[in-house]
Design a protein with these regions (language model features):
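N-terminal flexible segment immediately upstream of the FAD-binding catalytic core
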Residues: 57-90, 132-138
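Short, glycine/acidic-enriched capping/hinge loops at junctions between secondary-structure elements
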Residues: 73-74, 109-113, 350-351
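Extended, compositionally biased flexible segments
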Residues: 85-175
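Conserved, structured C-terminal
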Residues: 2-18, 22-65, 69-72, 148-150, ...
């Protein structure tokens, strides 16, 4: 990996992840990197490949272990990151879990698992929501689309696929015993492409029917359509993503994935990008990574994700962990997710945070994610959980990395303004 950012991450053992998938603890020298990114397919389990694996190999995607997805392409992580911010990049996120929830009672069933209000969500709209447990902890974060075709389209983290499916099937069995009309279909033959960046609509629009005008298709809206007006290439398009930029997530069959990808690349605008820039883009945008920034011991209140909890759901208090979560909403939580900026070495996950005043030896929090920000000229940024009394923006704290104490500051997130293509609001005079 050629960029300063990637070397920085490797040297500090930061776990690079793509929404829910840990690539590895990236330590070592260039020789070990080359060994890790070898294009030898003989030892790669088919179950760990996406439909676009051969495309990545043939187009210089630097494959890493685990899920065989590229960390980067020929461009450095920084170059891909900045290109996404200025133009458009395509990410293969086909490893993520895609499911359909079907049946007349699908909304009633799924609301028993999450915190959001699906009943009042308009058709062909999506929302970010959370699976929670009875203790108020976050089991996973996910995107749910309420389609006009009579099903819910759900996309959740690959790293939680086993746990999510077990949870879903347990709850499904209970629902069926109660007489609910509901079922789940795992879309194992579907790929998922994320086209992200300010020129994404320019890339995608020529491949859509004239009835789908992207200038009137807004953030978190969804549509089932045909790619290139070809009825043999149906696809679901959501205007959403994990970079903070305008963009689209396109669900297509594995059989059509490479064809669609090549068509998008033929614009000469979009470039391929890997998991390295995806991680730094989401961090700059203040977006959580499951397993780092949220987990089963973290509540939506602590994670500053209370906006995902629907007003009706709060009133009914009928979601898992509602008693604990609503009590924290009323009285506050003991800790809070915050943004930090620091000088010196970049803080990585697990680095302890201490009070810079009074008792400087007392640990008041821990870093959960960190990287040098490409958009901010490699300014060190990170997310952390800090005791609530110390979480005020502007508060100074200290971090210790390799026996060196450095100052950090609590800052607002996102670190870089998000640029979602939102519907215009009607302002009353």
């Amino acid at each position: 990996m050629s960029s300063f950012l990637t070397r920085n991450l490797i040297n500090r053992g930061l776990i690079l992840q793509c929404r829910g998938i840990a690539l590895s603890s990236l330590k070592g020298n260039n020789k070990s990197e080359e060994a890790s990114t070898s294009h030898n397919t003989a030892n790669v389990s088919p179950s760990k490949k996406t439909a676009l694996y051969n495309f990545h190999v043939n187009n210089s995607g630097r494959i890493f272990c685990g899920w065989t997805l590229p960390v980067q392409y020929s461009a450095s992580v920084i170059q891909s990151h900045l290109y996404t911010r200025s133009d458009a990049s395509i990410f293969d996120v086909s490893h993520m879990l895609q499911i359909h929830v079907k049946g007349a009672d699908r909304v009633r069933f799924f609301e028993k698992l999450i915190v959001s209000d699906l009943e009042n969500l308009p058709e062909n709209s999506a929302c970010l929501t959370l699976y929670t447990n009875d203790h108020g902890g976050i089991l996973d974060d996910l995107i749910v689309t309420k389609t006009s075709e009579g099903y819910l389209f759900v996309v959740s983290n690959a790293g939680r696929a086993t746990e999510d499916l077990a949870h879903l099937h347990t709850q499904l069995a209970k629902a069926k015993r109660q007489g609910l009309d509901v079922d789940i279909e795992v879309l194992s033959n579907q790929a998922l492409l994320a086209l992200q960046g300010p020129r994404s609509a320019e890339v995608l629009q020529p491949h859509l029917p004239s009835s789908l005008d992207l200038s009137k298709f807004y953030f978190m809206q969804s549509r089932l359509t045909n790619f290139d007006n070809n009825s043999s290439i149906p696809c679901r398009i959501n205007r959403s993503g994990y970079t903070g930029e305008d963009g689209f997530e396109i669900s297509i069959s594995n059989a059509n994935a490479e064809r669609v990808l090549n068509a998008l690349l033929s614009s000469g605008i979009a470039q391929m990008a890997g998991l390295g820039p995806r991680d730094s883009l989401r961090l700059e945008s203040g977006l959580c990574l499951y397993g780092n920034d949220i987990d089963e011991q973290t509540t939506p209140v602590e994670a500053d994700l209370t906006w995902t909890i629907g007003k009706r759901r709060r009133q009914l208090a009928d979601f898992p962990g509602a008693k604990i979560i609503l009590e924290q909403l009323e009285k506050g939580a003991s800790r809070k997710r915050v943004g930090i900026k620091s000088s010196g070495s970049c803080p990585r996950s697990g680095v302890e945070i201490r009070n810079s005043r009074d008792d400087k030896s007392r640990i008041i929090g821990k870093v959960t994610s960190g990287c040098p920000s490409p958009s901010l000229k490699l300014q060190n940024i990170g997310m952390a959980y800090i005791e609530t009394p110390f979480s005020k923006v502007g508060n100074k704290v200290t971090i210790n990395i390799r026996n060196r104490t450095m100052e950090a500051e609590i800052v607002k997130m996102p670190f870089v303004p998000t640029r979602y293509y939102k519907a215009p609001t009607n302002k009353k005079k």
